[in-house]
Amino acid sequence: MNESIVISLGGSVISGDPIDADYLQSFAKILASSKFKRIGIVTGGGKTARSYISLLRSLGINENMLDEIGIYATRMNALSLASLLKGANPIIPSTVEEAVNLMSEYRFVVMGGTEPGHTTDTVAALLCERSDTDTLINITSVDGVYDLDPNKYKDARRFDTLGYREAITLSTGSSVGAGPNVFMDITALSIAMRSKIKVIVASRDLNNLKNILEGKPSVFTSIEEKA
């Protein structure tokens, strides 16, 4: 890892009623104590986004507008986190380019979604690529990438490492219908592959995240180029 890192913080991870404030506070403390000089964080929409989208879809709102509503939910989560981080950007950027520029000014740059059709994982991968950051930590609801949904199958096997193409194949197979086994979308993985960004897929466990940031033994799946 270099002096910068990007974290994709899944919306389901920070969901509460409507947001898990205790988790965000603890998450912020861990980041503040880390060795990294620049940290980009991209937040998902979580429960807030799902609630609005579900309600408005039932009223016949078109999918493009629903995407926009989801993006604003991610930015609200981003602003909530930024308010807890000393040295974070006070205004949430609406593009990756804006976020990259802010990374030269702030230690922590927090953002949400950018445009319809781009997941926050894709935004995080683009932020890595454009800021020359070589590692992306994807915090999800499970502790890595599995061959099967671990919440449904007791014999599901977690991978310690995967190549990019292996990960894309698994993501393609699990992307029909959202669920716990959809660890990262294909576009985000393709960006990681073309720029050789190491992706660490880990759970919301904060002690585990602290160990990852400190380079200590931890539980995750690493997605990177295989020899």
From Swiss-Prot:
Keywords per UniProt: ATP-binding, Cytoplasm, Kinase, Nucleotide-binding, Pyrimidine biosynthesis, Transferase
InterPro entries linked to this entry: AceGlu_kinase-like_sf, Asp/Glu/Uridylate_kinase, Uridylate_kinase, Uridylate_kinase_arch/spir
Pathway named in the protein's UniProt entry: Pyrimidine metabolism; CTP biosynthesis via de novo pathway; UDP from UMP (UMPK route): step 1/1
Residues that hold UMP according to the record: G45, D67, T114, E115, P116, G117, H118, T119, T120
Any one GO molecular function term: ATP binding
Domain of life assignment: Archaea
Residues that hold ATP according to the record: G11, S12, G46, R50, T140, Y146, D149
The UniProt record lists the keyword Coiled coil: no
Activity modulation notes: Inhibited by UTP.
EC number from the UniProt entry: 2.7.4.22
Compartments (UniProt record): Cytoplasm
Catalytic activity: UMP + ATP = UDP + ADP
NCBIfam families linked to this entry: pyrH_arch
Quaternary state and interactors: Homohexamer.
Role: Catalyzes the reversible phosphorylation of UMP to UDP.
Family: Belongs to the UMP kinase family.
Name under which the protein is recorded: Uridylate kinase
Organism: Thermoplasma volcanium (strain ATCC 51530 / DSM 4299 / JCM 9571 / NBRC 15438 / GSS1)
Gene this chain is encoded by: pyrH
